[in-house]
Amino acid sequence: MAANRRLFTSESVTEGHPDKMSDQISDAILDEILKKDPNARVACETTVTTGLVLVSGEISTSTYVDIPALVRETVKEIGYTRAKYGFDFETCAVLTAIDEQSADIAGGVNQALEARQGKMSEEEIDAIGAGDQGLMFGYACDETEELMPLPISLAHQLSKRLADVRKEGIVDYLRPDGKTQVTVEYDENDKPERIDTIVISTQHHSEIQNEQIERDMIEKVIQAVVPSELLDDKTKYFINPTGRFVIGGPQGDVGLTGRKIIVDTYGGYARHGGGAFSGKDATKVDRSAAYAARYVAKNIVAAGLAKSCEVQLAYAIGVAQPVSIAVNTFGTGKVSEDRLVEAVRELFDLRPAGIIRMLDLRKPIYKNTAAYGHFGRKDILFPWEKTDKTEELIALTK
Protein backbone atom coordinates (compact mmCIF):
# COMPACT_ATOMS: atom_id res chain seq x y z
CA MET A 1 0.00 0.00 0.00
CA ALA A 2 1.34 3.42 -0.97
CA ALA A 3 2.35 6.02 1.58
CA ASN A 4 -0.33 8.34 3.00
CA ARG A 5 -3.01 5.72 2.41
CA ARG A 6 -4.84 3.89 5.15
CA LEU A 7 -7.10 0.92 5.78
CA PHE A 8 -10.16 1.00 8.01
CA THR A 9 -12.35 -1.95 9.00
CA SER A 10 -15.89 -2.23 10.39
CA GLU A 11 -18.08 -5.24 11.13
CA SER A 12 -21.76 -6.09 11.32
CA VAL A 13 -23.77 -9.12 12.40
CA THR A 14 -27.06 -10.62 11.22
CA GLU A 15 -30.31 -10.64 13.16
CA GLY A 16 -29.62 -14.27 14.08
CA HIS A 17 -26.43 -13.46 15.97
CA PRO A 18 -27.13 -14.18 19.67
CA ASP A 19 -26.29 -10.65 20.84
CA LYS A 20 -28.59 -9.20 18.19
CA MET A 21 -31.31 -11.67 19.15
CA SER A 22 -31.11 -10.22 22.66
CA ASP A 23 -31.31 -6.66 21.34
CA GLN A 24 -34.36 -7.46 19.21
CA ILE A 25 -36.17 -9.20 22.06
CA SER A 26 -35.51 -6.27 24.41
CA ASP A 27 -36.75 -3.76 21.84
CA ALA A 28 -39.77 -5.88 20.91
CA ILE A 29 -40.81 -5.78 24.57
CA LEU A 30 -40.17 -2.02 24.71
CA ASP A 31 -42.29 -1.41 21.60
CA GLU A 32 -45.18 -3.51 22.86
CA ILE A 33 -45.23 -1.56 26.13
CA LEU A 34 -45.02 1.82 24.35
CA LYS A 35 -48.00 0.91 22.14
CA LYS A 36 -50.21 0.89 25.24
CA ASP A 37 -48.27 3.13 27.63
CA PRO A 38 -46.11 5.76 25.86
CA ASN A 39 -44.85 7.12 29.18
CA ALA A 40 -43.60 3.80 30.52
CA ARG A 41 -40.10 3.50 31.95
CA VAL A 42 -38.32 0.51 30.48
CA ALA A 43 -34.85 -0.93 31.01
CA CYS A 44 -35.10 -4.43 29.59
CA GLU A 45 -32.14 -6.82 29.34
CA THR A 46 -32.16 -10.18 27.58
CA THR A 47 -29.83 -13.18 27.78
CA VAL A 48 -30.06 -16.04 25.29
CA THR A 49 -28.22 -19.35 25.59
CA THR A 50 -28.83 -22.97 24.65
CA GLY A 51 -32.56 -23.59 25.03
CA LEU A 52 -33.15 -20.56 27.26
CA VAL A 53 -34.16 -16.89 27.11
CA LEU A 54 -33.93 -14.82 30.31
CA VAL A 55 -35.58 -11.39 30.35
CA SER A 56 -34.73 -9.13 33.27
CA GLY A 57 -34.71 -5.44 34.12
CA GLU A 58 -36.73 -2.60 35.57
CA ILE A 59 -40.09 -1.74 34.01
CA SER A 60 -42.64 0.73 35.39
CA THR A 61 -45.87 0.68 33.36
CA SER A 62 -49.64 0.68 33.69
CA THR A 63 -50.08 -1.99 31.01
CA TYR A 64 -49.64 -5.75 30.75
CA VAL A 65 -47.42 -7.38 28.15
CA ASP A 66 -47.15 -11.12 27.52
CA ILE A 67 -43.35 -11.28 27.55
CA PRO A 68 -42.97 -15.03 26.84
CA ALA A 69 -45.24 -14.77 23.78
CA LEU A 70 -43.30 -11.74 22.51
CA VAL A 71 -40.01 -13.58 22.98
CA ARG A 72 -41.21 -16.60 21.01
CA GLU A 73 -42.64 -14.48 18.20
CA THR A 74 -39.39 -12.53 17.87
CA VAL A 75 -37.26 -15.68 17.82
CA LYS A 76 -39.59 -17.11 15.17
CA GLU A 77 -39.29 -14.00 12.99
CA ILE A 78 -35.51 -14.16 13.20
CA GLY A 79 -35.60 -17.71 11.87
CA TYR A 80 -34.90 -20.13 14.72
CA THR A 81 -37.82 -22.38 13.83
CA ARG A 82 -36.31 -25.88 13.96
CA ALA A 83 -34.57 -27.78 16.73
CA LYS A 84 -31.73 -28.77 14.41
CA TYR A 85 -30.74 -25.08 14.20
CA GLY A 86 -29.71 -25.40 17.85
CA PHE A 87 -32.52 -23.12 19.06
CA ASP A 88 -36.27 -23.28 18.51
CA PHE A 89 -38.93 -20.68 19.34
CA GLU A 90 -41.45 -23.33 20.38
CA THR A 91 -39.30 -25.39 22.73
CA CYS A 92 -36.98 -22.80 24.32
CA ALA A 93 -37.62 -21.91 27.96
CA VAL A 94 -38.48 -18.27 28.73
CA LEU A 95 -37.79 -16.90 32.22
CA THR A 96 -38.55 -13.38 33.45
CA ALA A 97 -37.18 -11.38 36.37
CA ILE A 98 -38.70 -7.89 36.22
CA ASP A 99 -38.67 -5.16 38.89
CA GLU A 100 -39.95 -1.58 38.90
CA GLN A 101 -37.68 1.40 38.28
CA SER A 102 -35.92 2.58 41.43
CA ALA A 103 -37.88 5.31 43.23
CA ASP A 104 -34.64 7.24 43.73
CA ILE A 105 -33.98 7.34 39.98
CA ALA A 106 -37.63 8.02 39.15
CA GLY A 107 -37.67 11.09 41.39
CA GLY A 108 -34.91 12.79 39.41
CA VAL A 109 -36.29 11.76 36.04
CA ASN A 110 -39.91 12.75 36.73
CA GLN A 111 -38.91 16.26 37.77
CA ALA A 112 -35.56 17.67 36.75
CA LEU A 113 -33.24 19.39 39.22
CA GLU A 114 -33.97 22.73 37.53
CA ALA A 115 -37.69 22.29 38.21
CA ARG A 116 -37.12 21.28 41.82
CA GLN A 117 -35.01 24.41 42.33
CA GLY A 118 -37.60 26.69 40.72
CA LYS A 119 -35.31 27.60 37.82
CA MET A 120 -37.76 26.69 35.04
CA SER A 121 -40.63 28.68 33.61
CA GLU A 122 -44.14 27.21 33.58
CA GLU A 123 -43.65 26.27 29.93
CA GLU A 124 -40.56 24.26 30.82
CA ILE A 125 -41.79 22.68 34.04
CA ASP A 126 -42.68 19.39 32.34
CA ALA A 127 -39.04 18.85 31.41
CA ILE A 128 -37.72 15.56 32.71
CA GLY A 129 -34.26 14.97 34.07
CA ALA A 130 -31.71 12.73 32.42
CA GLY A 131 -32.10 9.08 33.42
CA ASP A 132 -28.38 8.78 34.14
CA GLN A 133 -25.10 10.59 33.82
CA GLY A 134 -23.02 9.87 30.76
CA LEU A 135 -21.58 11.02 27.46
CA MET A 136 -22.94 10.28 24.01
CA PHE A 137 -21.54 10.79 20.52
CA GLY A 138 -23.14 11.34 17.15
CA TYR A 139 -21.32 11.36 13.83
CA ALA A 140 -21.84 12.01 10.14
CA CYS A 141 -19.57 12.28 7.11
CA ASP A 142 -20.01 12.67 3.37
CA GLU A 143 -18.59 9.26 2.34
CA THR A 144 -22.03 7.85 1.49
CA GLU A 145 -25.45 9.12 0.46
CA GLU A 146 -26.77 8.37 3.94
CA LEU A 147 -23.84 10.35 5.44
CA MET A 148 -22.22 7.37 7.12
CA PRO A 149 -18.70 5.92 7.00
CA LEU A 150 -18.42 3.50 4.08
CA PRO A 151 -17.02 0.49 6.02
CA ILE A 152 -19.97 0.16 8.41
CA SER A 153 -22.47 1.00 5.67
CA LEU A 154 -21.26 -1.86 3.49
CA ALA A 155 -20.92 -4.25 6.44
CA HIS A 156 -24.57 -3.64 7.38
CA GLN A 157 -25.74 -4.06 3.79
CA LEU A 158 -23.90 -7.38 3.55
CA SER A 159 -25.42 -8.62 6.81
CA LYS A 160 -28.91 -7.61 5.70
CA ARG A 161 -28.38 -9.30 2.34
CA LEU A 162 -27.16 -12.43 4.11
CA ALA A 163 -30.46 -12.59 6.01
CA ASP A 164 -32.51 -11.76 2.92
CA VAL A 165 -31.08 -14.56 0.75
CA ARG A 166 -31.76 -16.98 3.61
CA LYS A 167 -35.34 -15.87 4.20
CA GLU A 168 -36.18 -15.66 0.50
CA GLY A 169 -34.73 -19.10 -0.22
CA ILE A 170 -32.12 -17.76 -2.65
CA VAL A 171 -29.46 -19.60 -0.63
CA ASP A 172 -31.52 -22.26 1.09
CA TYR A 173 -28.83 -23.92 3.20
CA LEU A 174 -28.10 -20.90 5.39
CA ARG A 175 -29.02 -20.65 9.06
CA PRO A 176 -29.68 -17.42 10.98
CA ASP A 177 -26.31 -16.64 12.60
CA GLY A 178 -23.75 -14.66 10.64
CA LYS A 179 -21.16 -11.88 10.63
CA THR A 180 -19.63 -9.59 8.02
CA GLN A 181 -16.56 -7.36 7.96
CA VAL A 182 -15.34 -4.84 5.39
CA THR A 183 -11.91 -3.23 5.08
CA VAL A 184 -11.82 -0.06 2.97
CA GLU A 185 -8.66 1.49 1.53
CA TYR A 186 -8.56 5.28 1.63
CA ASP A 187 -6.46 7.33 -0.79
CA GLU A 188 -4.05 10.19 -0.10
CA ASN A 189 -6.99 12.61 0.22
CA ASP A 190 -8.70 10.29 2.71
CA LYS A 191 -11.39 9.30 0.23
CA PRO A 192 -12.62 5.68 -0.05
CA GLU A 193 -10.97 4.16 -3.11
CA ARG A 194 -11.42 0.38 -3.00
CA ILE A 195 -12.36 -2.59 -0.88
CA ASP A 196 -9.28 -4.36 0.42
CA THR A 197 -10.90 -7.24 2.31
CA ILE A 198 -14.36 -8.73 2.88
CA VAL A 199 -15.03 -11.34 5.57
CA ILE A 200 -18.29 -13.30 5.76
CA SER A 201 -18.96 -15.99 8.34
CA THR A 202 -22.37 -17.61 7.96
CA GLN A 203 -24.05 -20.48 9.74
CA HIS A 204 -25.05 -23.28 7.36
CA HIS A 205 -26.43 -26.79 7.06
CA SER A 206 -23.90 -29.50 7.84
CA GLU A 207 -23.89 -31.13 4.41
CA ILE A 208 -22.84 -28.05 2.41
CA GLN A 209 -19.24 -27.77 1.24
CA ASN A 210 -17.31 -24.56 1.85
CA GLU A 211 -16.52 -24.18 -1.85
CA GLN A 212 -20.22 -23.76 -2.63
CA ILE A 213 -20.69 -21.36 0.28
CA GLU A 214 -17.80 -19.21 -0.95
CA ARG A 215 -19.14 -19.14 -4.50
CA ASP A 216 -22.66 -18.24 -3.38
CA MET A 217 -21.50 -15.57 -0.94
CA ILE A 218 -19.44 -13.81 -3.60
CA GLU A 219 -22.05 -14.06 -6.36
CA LYS A 220 -25.31 -13.67 -4.43
CA VAL A 221 -24.33 -11.53 -1.46
CA ILE A 222 -21.18 -9.50 -2.11
CA GLN A 223 -21.73 -8.71 -5.79
CA ALA A 224 -25.36 -7.84 -5.08
CA VAL A 225 -24.37 -5.22 -2.51
CA VAL A 226 -20.87 -3.83 -3.09
CA PRO A 227 -20.43 -1.47 -6.08
CA SER A 228 -18.29 -3.22 -8.69
CA GLU A 229 -15.96 -0.24 -9.02
CA LEU A 230 -14.82 -0.78 -5.42
CA LEU A 231 -13.80 -4.40 -6.09
CA ASP A 232 -10.66 -5.40 -8.00
CA ASP A 233 -8.41 -8.40 -8.52
CA LYS A 234 -6.55 -7.58 -5.31
CA THR A 235 -9.65 -7.62 -3.10
CA LYS A 236 -9.37 -10.46 -0.60
CA TYR A 237 -12.35 -12.63 0.38
CA PHE A 238 -12.49 -14.73 3.54
CA ILE A 239 -15.67 -16.81 3.52
CA ASN A 240 -16.16 -19.01 6.61
CA PRO A 241 -12.39 -19.06 7.17
CA THR A 242 -12.69 -21.65 9.97
CA GLY A 243 -14.01 -24.05 7.33
CA ARG A 244 -17.23 -24.93 9.16
CA PHE A 245 -20.00 -22.96 10.90
CA VAL A 246 -22.83 -25.36 11.72
CA ILE A 247 -23.19 -24.70 15.45
CA GLY A 248 -24.25 -21.09 15.91
CA GLY A 249 -26.78 -18.78 17.49
CA PRO A 250 -27.44 -19.21 21.22
CA GLN A 251 -26.14 -22.77 21.07
CA GLY A 252 -22.73 -21.51 20.00
CA ASP A 253 -22.48 -18.35 22.11
CA VAL A 254 -24.41 -16.69 24.90
CA GLY A 255 -26.12 -13.51 23.69
CA LEU A 256 -26.63 -10.37 25.76
CA THR A 257 -28.44 -7.10 25.15
CA GLY A 258 -26.09 -4.20 24.49
CA ARG A 259 -22.98 -6.12 23.49
CA LYS A 260 -22.80 -4.82 19.92
CA ILE A 261 -22.59 -1.08 20.57
CA ILE A 262 -19.99 -0.43 17.86
CA VAL A 263 -22.01 -2.39 15.29
CA ASP A 264 -25.05 -0.34 16.34
CA THR A 265 -23.32 2.99 15.69
CA TYR A 266 -20.41 3.86 13.37
CA GLY A 267 -18.28 0.74 13.22
CA GLY A 268 -15.50 2.30 15.29
CA TYR A 269 -15.10 5.24 12.90
CA ALA A 270 -16.30 7.68 15.56
CA ARG A 271 -16.04 7.61 19.34
CA HIS A 272 -18.61 5.94 21.58
CA GLY A 273 -19.72 6.94 25.07
CA GLY A 274 -20.18 3.33 26.17
CA GLY A 275 -23.94 3.20 26.68
CA ALA A 276 -26.06 0.65 24.84
CA PHE A 277 -29.41 1.39 23.19
CA SER A 278 -31.76 -1.60 23.05
CA GLY A 279 -34.39 -2.17 25.70
CA LYS A 280 -34.28 1.44 26.94
CA ASP A 281 -37.08 3.99 26.72
CA ALA A 282 -36.27 7.52 25.61
CA THR A 283 -35.75 8.96 29.11
CA LYS A 284 -32.49 7.02 29.05
CA VAL A 285 -30.07 9.47 27.44
CA ASP A 286 -27.75 6.61 26.51
CA ARG A 287 -30.24 6.10 23.70
CA SER A 288 -32.12 9.33 23.09
CA ALA A 289 -29.12 11.66 23.32
CA ALA A 290 -27.08 9.43 21.00
CA TYR A 291 -29.91 9.72 18.49
CA ALA A 292 -30.02 13.49 19.00
CA ALA A 293 -26.25 13.76 18.54
CA ARG A 294 -26.51 11.89 15.22
CA TYR A 295 -29.39 14.18 14.20
CA VAL A 296 -27.29 17.27 14.91
CA ALA A 297 -24.16 15.93 13.22
CA LYS A 298 -26.05 14.76 10.13
CA ASN A 299 -27.75 18.12 9.68
CA ILE A 300 -24.41 19.93 9.99
CA VAL A 301 -22.90 17.77 7.24
CA ALA A 302 -26.04 17.88 5.09
CA ALA A 303 -25.97 21.68 5.34
CA GLY A 304 -22.48 21.69 3.85
CA LEU A 305 -21.02 23.19 7.02
CA ALA A 306 -18.53 20.32 7.36
CA LYS A 307 -17.52 17.16 5.51
CA SER A 308 -17.14 15.24 8.76
CA CYS A 309 -18.70 16.05 12.12
CA GLU A 310 -18.74 14.46 15.57
CA VAL A 311 -21.04 15.80 18.29
CA GLN A 312 -20.61 14.97 21.97
CA LEU A 313 -23.38 15.49 24.52
CA ALA A 314 -23.03 14.86 28.26
CA TYR A 315 -25.57 14.75 31.09
CA ALA A 316 -25.90 14.54 34.87
CA ILE A 317 -28.57 12.26 36.32
CA GLY A 318 -31.75 14.16 37.19
CA VAL A 319 -30.61 17.33 35.39
CA ALA A 320 -32.39 18.41 32.20
CA GLN A 321 -29.81 20.58 30.44
CA PRO A 322 -26.74 18.84 29.02
CA VAL A 323 -23.63 19.64 31.04
CA SER A 324 -21.63 20.00 27.82
CA ILE A 325 -21.99 20.15 24.05
CA ALA A 326 -18.93 19.71 21.84
CA VAL A 327 -18.55 19.73 18.05
CA ASN A 328 -15.51 18.43 16.17
CA THR A 329 -15.30 18.86 12.39
CA PHE A 330 -11.76 17.46 12.03
CA GLY A 331 -10.57 20.45 10.05
CA THR A 332 -13.37 20.17 7.47
CA GLY A 333 -15.67 22.87 8.87
CA LYS A 334 -16.76 25.91 6.86
CA VAL A 335 -17.32 27.84 10.10
CA SER A 336 -15.70 27.63 13.51
CA GLU A 337 -16.64 24.86 15.91
CA ASP A 338 -17.52 27.48 18.53
CA ARG A 339 -20.04 28.99 16.11
CA LEU A 340 -21.50 25.57 15.43
CA VAL A 341 -21.92 24.92 19.16
CA GLU A 342 -23.76 28.24 19.50
CA ALA A 343 -26.04 27.33 16.60
CA VAL A 344 -26.72 23.88 18.03
CA ARG A 345 -27.64 25.33 21.43
CA GLU A 346 -30.01 27.79 19.77
CA LEU A 347 -31.68 25.40 17.33
CA PHE A 348 -31.91 22.04 19.12
CA ASP A 349 -33.60 21.43 22.48
CA LEU A 350 -31.23 18.84 23.93
CA ARG A 351 -32.97 18.34 27.26
CA PRO A 352 -34.41 14.80 27.48
CA ALA A 353 -38.00 16.05 27.13
CA GLY A 354 -36.92 18.26 24.24
CA ILE A 355 -35.25 15.36 22.45
CA ILE A 356 -38.31 13.16 22.97
CA ARG A 357 -40.57 15.82 21.44
CA MET A 358 -38.14 16.75 18.67
CA LEU A 359 -37.66 13.16 17.50
CA ASP A 360 -41.07 11.76 18.55
CA LEU A 361 -39.44 9.05 20.64
CA ARG A 362 -42.47 7.78 22.54
CA LYS A 363 -43.63 5.78 19.52
CA PRO A 364 -42.95 2.02 19.19
CA ILE A 365 -40.20 2.30 16.58
CA TYR A 366 -37.34 0.55 18.31
CA LYS A 367 -37.46 -3.08 17.26
CA ASN A 368 -36.52 -2.06 13.72
CA THR A 369 -33.37 -0.38 15.03
CA ALA A 370 -32.12 -3.50 16.78
CA ALA A 371 -30.44 -5.13 13.77
CA TYR A 372 -28.41 -3.63 10.89
CA GLY A 373 -27.65 -0.34 12.59
CA HIS A 374 -29.46 2.52 14.28
CA PHE A 375 -28.05 5.08 11.84
CA GLY A 376 -27.85 5.54 8.09
CA ARG A 377 -30.46 2.94 7.22
CA LYS A 378 -31.61 2.80 3.61
CA ASP A 379 -34.73 0.73 4.33
CA ILE A 380 -36.22 2.91 7.11
CA LEU A 381 -36.11 6.67 7.71
CA PHE A 382 -35.89 7.11 11.47
CA PRO A 383 -36.68 10.60 12.85
CA TRP A 384 -33.04 11.26 13.79
CA GLU A 385 -32.03 10.64 10.17
CA LYS A 386 -34.01 13.58 8.80
CA THR A 387 -32.07 16.56 7.45
CA ASP A 388 -34.76 19.16 8.11
CA LYS A 389 -32.61 21.66 10.04
CA THR A 390 -30.09 22.46 7.32
CA GLU A 391 -31.50 25.82 6.23
CA GLU A 392 -31.81 27.05 9.80
CA LEU A 393 -28.25 25.94 10.57
CA ILE A 394 -26.94 27.79 7.54
CA ALA A 395 -28.84 30.93 8.54
CA LEU A 396 -27.57 30.78 12.13
CA THR A 397 -23.93 30.36 11.08
CA LYS A 398 -23.71 33.15 8.49
UniProtKB/Swiss-Prot annotation:
One of the GO biological process terms: one-carbon metabolic process
Sites where the protein binds L-methionine: 58, 101, 253, 284
Cofactor: Mg(2+); K(+)
Pathway per the UniProt entry: Amino-acid biosynthesis; S-adenosyl-L-methionine biosynthesis; S-adenosyl-L-methionine from L-methionine: step 1/1
CDD domains: S-AdoMet_synt
Chief place of localization: cytoplasm
SUPFAM superfamilies: S-adenosylmethionine synthetase (SSF55973)
Segments for region (Flexible loop): 101-111
Record's keyword terms, sorted: ATP-binding, Cytoplasm, Magnesium, Metal-binding, Nucleotide-binding, One-carbon metabolism, Potassium, Transferase
Catalytic activity: L-methionine + ATP + H2O = S-adenosyl-L-methionine + phosphate + diphosphate
Textual note on the cofactor: Binds 2 divalent ions per subunit. Binds 1 potassium ion per subunit.
UniProt KW Magnesium keyword: yes
HAMAP family, A to Z: S_AdoMet_synth1 (MF_00086)
Protein name, per record: S-adenosylmethionine synthase
